[in-house]
Amino acid sequence: PIRESVRVSTDRDPDLEDEKREQLGESMQTELERLTWGVEVGTSEDINVDTVKRWGLQNNKYNAEHWIPPGGQRTAEDMGKLYQFWDEFIETYENEVMMNSGYREPLNKDKVFNTLLDHSNNKTNQTAEELKGIQTKIERMTMYFYEANVYESLGQLKNKFINIDEQTAKDYLLDKLEKPDDLDIVRAMGTYTLECIVVFVLSKQFNVFALDKASVQVATLVSELDSAAKIEYNRIIAEDRKRKKAKWGDKQINEDENILLQDKGVDTFNGDVHSELDRKKKSISKQTNRKRVRISKHKEPGIGEALFGWLASRKLIEVKKPVFLFDKKNKKPKNVIYPGYVDCLFDIKDLPFCSTLPMVYPPADWELWPTATAEVSDPYITNLTPLSSYRGGYLTSLQRESGDSPTLLSEKDYGVFDIHIDRERSQPVLSAVKKLQWQPYRINKLVYDFIQKHWSVLVSVGLLRPKNLALFKRKEALRLLSSLLFKHEELSTIYRYSELKSVLLKNIHASTFELYTMKIAEAYLDYKIYFPIFLDFRGRNYRHGPFHFHERDLVRSLIIFDESDDSAAHTINSDVGDRILHNFLISAAYHKSKFGVYREALEFIYNKIEDMQSKPTFFEKDIFVDTLCCRHPFQYISSCISLKTYADTKDLSVLRYTPVFQDASASAYQIMSYFLLDIDYGIHTNLLKKTNTDGRYIRDIYEFMWGCLIKYLIAEEKIELAIKLLTPNEKDQESVLAKIVSIFDRNVVKKMFMPMMYGKTDYTLKKDVEDLLKGKSDSEGINLISKHISTYWKVNFGKMKDLMDLINYVSWFGAGQDKPVVYSTPYWVTLQTYKWRKRVKMKIQYETTKNNEKEVKTTSAKMLIPLNDNDIRKSSTSTFANFIHQKDAFTAIQLVDFINKLENASSIPIYAVHDNFITMPEYASILPTLYRDSIFRMGHPLIIINKFLFDHILIPAIQNEHPQNKHLFSVEERSMLDRMMIDLQNPLIPDFGSVDITKARIKSIVIPKDLLLKCFSCLWMSKTKKISLVRWESCRDKIIKVYMRYTDDISSDEGVSRWLEYKNNLEFASDPVWSSDNTNGTQADSLDKGEDDYCIHY
C-alpha cells in the first residue's frame, strides 16, 4: 500500500516516549514536593511547563498543561481565567452545535469496526476459514485501494468530493494534462475513480493516529497522488489482460498490452525534476551542484500536480501561508519562508479508515516472491537473496501483483538500503520472524472496561481528553473559538488566537486518537490478534499500524498475551506460581517509578497491595492520584487491576498473561563495552555482573558519566586556580563546575552524551548547551562549557572515539570506491548506499476561485531528489550508528532463535522492540541470560572488525585484476588471507582452556600493518573516482593508526584477560542448545539463575 509515512512504527521511538513520560512523572513528583513545602507560583514570571503543573496541582486542575500554552509573562490569575474560558467553550459548543438537529457524528469509519464486531466470537463460532475470510476483508478495506470500498466509506465527504454540479477530477485532468501517457491513464479511469484515489491518499497521509503530524509536504502529497493513480492503472491493465487471456488465450493479446505503460510506483513529478536536473547539469559546476536548484514549473503538469490543483480548486486543501521574518531594527520584512506544507480544510476524522490493523488470522510466512530476482551477482554478496524479495505477513500481500504489497524489508528505497541473506545460513532470521508474528495476543477486557467506566476521572488527572472533543468539527469549533475570545476582551490581550487555536486542535487530535484507539480495542475484544513483522535495513523489527507494543502507554495497557494453538500442556506448580507472582510484582512497581534494586520495588508494591485491601476507595480515588507521578500510568492501572482480580479469584492466569517489559540497560553502550572489552563500561551498563558490600544494584552509565564529568571539572578548576595564582591580573572566569552542577543532572548528561555515540559534532553539542543555558549564561560561558564537555568526552572516552573513527573512516573509504557500505552479522549482510540529494524547489500552479472569479495561484514544493552519486560524507558519519543498531538487531534475533530451540518454545511468548523485550512474568527471569549469550554469539570483537575491513579493503584488493598486482602479495600473505577468510566464517573463538593459547589465537587474527599497506596501494591503482591523493592517504593513515592501536589493546595480556572475563560473564556455559547433536533443546527453567540480573531490567 501507499506508505503510511505518519503511522509506520519506524517513525516513532518508543524509548523516547517512555523517557518523556518518566521525566514528566519526575517533574510532577518534584512539584508535589514543592507544594508540601509551601512553594507558591510567582505573581508575574516567565511561565514554563513546570509552572503550569504547579498551578494545576495547587488548584486540582491536573490536566492544565493540556490547555494552557507555556511562554509569556502570565500570572496564576491569567491561567485560572483561561481554564474557565475552556470550560465555557466546551459547554457552549456542546449546547449550541452538538445539540443542533443537523449535527451528525462521522460514521464512515464504523464500517471497519462493525465488520469485526458482527463476526466476533460472541455472535458466531468462527472456523479458521471464516477468520481467514474476515482478515482478507479487513485488509481489502484498510490497506489497499479498492474503488467500491472507498466510495461506500465516503460518508459526509461524499458531497465535498463528488458533486454533479462540479467538474469531476477526470474531466479536470483531461483539460489540464498534455502528455499522451498521462491522458491514457486518466481515460482508463471510471467516472469517480480519481476522486476515490484522492480520498484514499489523503486517508493515508492525514491520519487520526498521527499525534505529531498535522500537515503534509506538498511534494509528498503530489508524489503519492501520482503514484497511486499509476498503481491503479497498472491494476486495471493487469485485470484486463487476465480477462482477455482467460477468454482468448495468450495469442490474442495485443503485444502492446503485454507491457504496462507506466513503471510501478514511479511518479511523473520526480521524473520531471530529474529531467530538469539533467538539463541543467552541464551548466552547474561541481561546487554549486550541491546547492539548492530552483526549477520553474514545467509546462506539462503530471497527474499528481493536476490532482493537487483539483483539490485546491475545490477548496478541500490549502497551502500553509508564508512566514515573514522581520528585521528588528528596521521593523520591515527581510525574508519570506514558504513552508511547502498543506492542510486539509475539512475534518480528517471524516476520512475513511486506511491504516493497517492487527490480524485475526496468523500472518502468512515470508516467502521468496516467484517473480523476484532470487540471486544477485556482486563480489561482496555472492549468492545472497535481497530481503526486499520476500512477501508475506498480511494475507493479501501474496495475492496482489500491482507492486504495492509490503515486503519483509520495511525500507522504501530497495537496493539503496537492503538486507541480503543466505537462505540456508539465515534460517534463524526467518524462524525468529515467524515466532514473533505467530504469537497471539488479545485485548485486556478488564482494563478496557475500567477506562470506559472512569473516563471522566482520567480526563481530570490529565491522562485522557474529553470524549466529545473527538466529535468537534474543525470549522465550527474555530468559528466559536474566535467569537468567544472576542467577547473576552481581557483574555484576548493575554493569549493570542493562534496560540489557543493550536491548543484546541491538538486536544481535538489527541481526543480522536484516544477514541479510535478504544474503538480498535472494542472491535478486537473477542479475537486472538497477531502482528506481522517487518525488518529495516539494519535488521531491527517493526510492526505497522497504530495498535501494537511499539505504541504509547494507553495502547500497551490494552494488549495481553494469549496461548498459541500449538502450546504444550502447561502445569503451574508452586515454584512456577511464586516466580510468576514475584516477577509480576516487580514489573508493576516499575510502572509506577524506578528503583535501585528489585527489593525496593517489592517493598513498594507490597505496601500498595495493603492499600488496595484496606482502602475501599483505592480504585475510585487513590489509584488516580498515583498516576500523577507514574512512569507508565495506564500500565500501572492495568497491573493494579490484575492484582485485585488475582486477590479476589486466586486465578494466576490473570497475572500470567499480562506482559512484562524489560529494557536493555543502555544497549548501545553495552555493545560498545563489548567491542572495547572495557570492564568499567560493562559494569556500569550492567552487562558484567559485579557485587559490592551493599549487594548488586542497577547501575546507570549516565550517572557514571555524570560523576566522571564532575571529577574532570574539579581537576580542571584546580589547574585554572593555579594559573590564576601565577597570573593575578587575569580576568576571572565564571566557574564551569558551579554552573554545570547547578543546571546539569543525569537526564541532561544523557541528552548530551547519548548522541555522541551516533556522531554528534562539537557544533551540535554547542547548540544543545545554548538551548540549555538560554538566559542563564553569556556566549563566552556557553563556549567555555561546550569546550569542557567536548574535551571531557575525547579524553575520558578516547578508546570509544577511536572505534567510532575506525568504522567511519573505513566506511568513507568503501563508499569512495563506488561500492555499497557493507556490514555483516552471522545471519545477514546489510547494504547501505547513501546518495547525494539535490535540494529542489519546484513551482506548482493551481486554480482556485475568489469572488466567483478564477484565480491562478503558485506554491512551492521543496524536495530532496536522490542523485546517482554516492554521498561519501553521509556514509562516513552515519555508518557507525547503523553498525551498532545492526548488532542490537542481531542480539534480538539471536535471543528469539535461542527460545525457538527450547523444547517448550511454543509456550514462551516473546515480543522484541529494538533492545526492549516483552514476555510473560513466568519467563522474564530467563531473558537476561539469553540476552548476554546473544551478545556473545556476535563473535570476538576483533573478528567482527576484521570482517568490516575485509569487506571494504582486503577483498576488493585481492579481487583487483590490475596487472601490477600480480606479484604484490607473497605466498605467505595469500595463505594468511585465505586462513583469515576461513576464520571470518566462524566469529566465535573456541575455549582452548589456556590463556597462552587464547592469546596466541587472538594475535594470529590481527591483520599485519604491511599487508594493509599493500592492500591500500592496490586499491589506489584501481581507483577511477577523482579523490585527491592527499585526502586518500590521510584516510589510509588514520585507518591503519587506529586499527593498530585497537589491536594492540585487544591482543595484549590485559586485553586477553578482559576477553576471558567477558566470555565468562556472557556465554551460557551449560549450553546443550548449541551442540550440533542436540535435538531436544533444554528446559527454560534451567536458564533462570534465581537471582536479580539487571543487564536487561524492568
Curated annotation (Swiss-Prot):
Entry keyword annotation includes Flavoprotein:
no
Its principal location? mitochondrion
Cite the Gene3D superfamilies for this sequence. 5' to 3' exonuclease, C-terminal subdomain
Give the EC number: 2.7.7.6
Residue span of region Disordered: 1-26
Cellular component terms (Gene Ontology): mitochondrial DNA-directed RNA polymerase complex; plastid
Residues at the catalytic site: D663, K750, D915
UniProt GO MF annotations: DNA binding; DNA-directed RNA polymerase activity
Q: Which InterPro entries match?
A: DNA-dir_Rpol_C_phage-type, DNA-dir_Rpol_phage-type, DNA/RNA_pol_sf
Enumerate the SUPFAM superfamilies for this protein: DNA/RNA polymerases
> What UniProt keywords apply to this chain's record, in alphabetical order?
DNA-directed RNA polymerase, Mitochondrion, Nucleotidyltransferase, Plasmid, Transcription, Transferase
Q: Where is the composition biased (Basic and acidic residues)?
A: 1-24
What processes in GO biological process is this protein linked to?
mitochondrial transcription
Q: Which reaction does it catalyse?
A: RNA(n) + a ribonucleoside 5'-triphosphate = RNA(n+1) + diphosphate
The SS bond pairs are none
Keyword Hydrolase in the entry? The reply is no
Where does this one sit in the cell? Mitochondrion
The entry's family comment says: Belongs to the phage and mitochondrial RNA polymerase family.
**What PANTHER family does its record include?**
DNA-DIRECTED RNA POLYMERASE, MITOCHONDRIAL, DNA-DIRECTED RNA POLYMERASE-RELATED
**Note from the entry:** These complexes consist of double-stranded linear DNAs with proteins covalently attached to the 5'-termini.
What role does this protein play? DNA-dependent RNA polymerase catalyzes the transcription of DNA into RNA using the four ribonucleoside triphosphates as substrates.
Q: What is this protein called?
A: Probable DNA-directed RNA polymerase
**Species name for this entry?**
Zea mays (Maize)
**From which lineage does this chain's organism come?**
Eukaryota, Viridiplantae, Streptophyta, Embryophyta, Tracheophyta
